[in-house]
UniProtKB/Swiss-Prot annotation:
Record has RNA-binding as a keyword: yes
Pfam families linked to this entry: Ribosomal_L7Ae
Name under which the protein is recorded: RNA-binding protein BH0128
Family: Belongs to the eukaryotic ribosomal protein eL8 family.
InterPro entries from the UniProt entry: Ribosomal_eL30-like_sf, Ribosomal_eL8/eL30/eS12/Gad45, RNA_bf_YbxF-like
Keywords (A to Z) from UniProt: RNA-binding
Gene Ontology molecular function, alphabetical: RNA binding
Keyword RNA-binding: yes
């Protein structure tokens, strides 16, 4: 998945807390994680996505991921909902 796919998605969950909630409720199709995010921030998302067998896609930049989501700040994680 690329930034372009995120920017074209119609149903996104932005941020680590919201991504974790969506994963718990099994509403997630794919998870996008920025490589420059702090490991302590994204570890739970990675673990839960792995357990639930949700594909994880890595992108280079939190700032670019946030911009692709239409926000002016960086985003560590984004989930595409089913």
């Amino acid at each position: 998945m690329s930034y372009e796919k995120v920017s074209q998605a119609t149903d996104l969950v932005i941020g680590t807390k919201q991504t974790l909630k969506a994963l718990e409720q099994e509403e997630v199709l794919e998870v996008v994680i920025a490589k420059d995010a702090e490991p302590r921030v994204v570890n739970k998302v990675e673990a839960m996505a792995s357990v639930k067998q949700i594909p994880i896609i890595y992108v280079d930049s939190m700032k670019k991921l946030g911009k692709a989501c239409g926000i002016d700040v960086g985003a560590a994680t984004v989930a595409l909902k089913k």
